[in-house]
Amino acid sequence: MRKSLFGYGGTTRAIAKSGGWDIYDDKFDEICSDENSKNNEKFRTDEFGNRLLNPREFNPQNSELEIPSPGFPPRHKLVQKAQNLISEYDYFSDFTGQKIWISGTNGKTTTTKMTQFLLEKFGAQMGANVGIPVANLDKSASIWILETSSFTIHYTKCATPEIYALLPITPDHLSWHGSFQEYENAKLKPFFMMKNGIAFAPKCYENRLKDCAAKIYFYENEIDLAKICGVNLGEISFKTPFLLDAVLALCIAKMAVGVADVELLNRFVIEANKLEEIRDKFGRLWVNDTKATNIDATICALRRYKGHKIHLILGGDDKGVDLSPVFEKLQNMDAKIYAIGINTQKIADMSVKFGINCEKCEFLDVAVEKISQNFHTNLDEVALLSPACASLDQFKSYAQRGDKFKEYIARLNLNCDLN
């Protein structure tokens, strides 16, 4: 019997180093050993004894377990045929250190990185959806801090954390899960699997989770979390939307090692691509929030700049999510939309429905140029790239979208007349 990996991305490629796997991916056109692969220069795994196979070669009768790349949806033909499907978390569930899982719709990367910043001196290592693949994490580390996607949770059968921290949930990845209910079920699944341990959850789930075995701290906002870990909100240097992430990270640290070090956390630097403020030569404020790939992140960004006139770049791959909440938020703001991406026309139609001014730009460089033409040189305006959509319809990643945004700002015709 063989072990099977579905897909050849970062997660499965790291696992494959252990050897003895059958790896199924559409890249592979024929049965071959790595040594004879036409892609030998790209897939150098012959020394591990793996076989690279086309998905049509998969026979569940010859496979004792299957681990999918997280991006493989439940309807994928390989997933449908699999009989012993587990997640990477299950495969490495024998890790004896403390496991911290952090999930939610928006803010989980920042919360995970903040938690790692607080716990690194205690021997913690960060990985999974951000940082190091689980297969490459140090098995002798005292703590694993795992940014945990709904995809991985969906496929997890037995692994559980000692601490599970859930940020608020709003619709996302609906094309993968099929519905918001299934997406929400995945995020809540660890609570029902935990036989002990500590967890944090939004207060709206209190009744639904009342019979869970874990000790769950419910919160409605930053004030609730500050009370849980015994810190003074006024001493924390982060503003919305990062304040919630910061206090949750402090709560996790308090439960994990007994210390919530606000002074240390205040030295943490927010990563690029999240509400990254840029001033052009004229002093105009541009904000790179390209990592806002869902409606909740964009709404948080809009709250941040409430009171300003906002030039909002919106659009991309909406993953089947209804963007109406963003438009409802914009109805009460002084804002104009510059629509880009594959859903440009959909955004334009919704703008008409909600009575919001919109320009169909389709491409990011066009949007930047249009904004520059309309951008007054005063302190009450902001140009905000917060797309509420994924980037893969036009870019390799959200990071590339952000890099291009900054590139287009830099190359604007600075000799143009300003209003």
PLM regions with names:
Residues 124-140:
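Conserved substrate/cofactor phosphate-moiety recognition/catalytic segment
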Residues 88-129:
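Walker A (P-loop) phosphate-binding motif
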Residues 140-212, 217-237, 393-399:
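Flexible active-site lid/hinge loop adjacent to a nucleotide/diphosphate
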Residues 235-334:
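Nucleotide phosphate-binding/pyrophosphate-handling subdomain across enzymes
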Residues 1-101, 272-274, 364-374, 383:
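Short, basic phosphate-binding NTP loop
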Residues 19, 66, 102, 147, ...:
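Residue-level signal for inorganic ion chemistry
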Residues 3-18, 24-35, 290-356, 360, ...:
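Active-site beta-alpha connecting loops in nucleotide-dependent enzymes
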